[in-house]
Amino acid sequence: KTFGCESGEPTFRYSLIDGVNDPDGPYLVNPTVVDARTEITTKLLADKGYSVMVQDDDEEEEETYFARDFEKKFFSDETNMMLVKTFMDNAMRDPITGEVGKGIVFCVSRKHAAKITQLLNVYADKMFPEMYYSDFAMQITSDIQGAQDYTINFQNNNLSGNTKFLEGYKSSKTRICVTVGMMTTGYDCEDILNIGLFRPIFSPTDFIQIKGRGTRTFTFNYKTRANGGWEEHSYPKTNFKLFDFFGNCEYFEEKYDYDEVIKLPQISASG
């Protein structure tokens, strides 16, 4: 009663939309939400689940898996590779260097994070030969020594040093942090341009917090010499991409209207 909250209703609420549309702002930016479900992740999400034939001794048995089983009971290297390829090929780029914009990828487990980190580094080496040398992506989980320091370095744009794309440009060489839950809450990195949901999310609080990692405003700046002086190049961050591979947005809001839909080819998988 002291604070006038006996009704249970908040006396003040400041939403993402409020932050985007604030007349004194904007103070936040909206995501461009990408529906990137594969055939397999779509079936894992269905009520009937995803059924595959599994060899058990001399017999084949049908096993049915659901979203909660991904990277716990159901494993598919092809699906993980498809997630990585889709993310890399469609990620927002840094407006100054043209390299993949900084991002955070959320995985099911530490083992899953290790797999995805390796796949991202291999794919980045093909896209940008000799630019990263396995520093493109870094696993940031609680079992990694120095992980907390890595998150700070990523925030300060010196994780693995600075980008090799443009001398003097203050941006991390490491572009993607791969985590499970460490960077979900209380982490503020303003120049994030890409968020990858490589796992299903069932907690609305976690979903809101993860989405919030990309909403901070930022201006990308770089100065070049021109006509005996300096010319400043400035690009305000107007949005970020949220890659939803497991229909998380639809899970929390039925018939969610995605901003972009990527049709992915069919792949095979085994349990």
Q: Can you describe what each PLM-predicted range is?
A:
Residues 2-101:
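Interdomain helical connector at the RecA1-RecA2 junction of SF1/SF2 helicase-like NTPases
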Residues 63-177:
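Conserved C-terminal RecA-like helicase domain
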Residues 2-14, 125-135, 218-230:
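Flexible phosphate/Mg2+-sensing switch loops adjacent to catalytic phosphate-binding sites
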Residues 65-72, 82-85, 246-271:
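Long, largely alpha-helical accessory region at the distal end of helicase-like NTP-driven motors
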Residues 7-12, 24-30, 100, 132-136, ...:
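Short glycine-/polar-rich loops that comprise or flank the Walker A/P-loop
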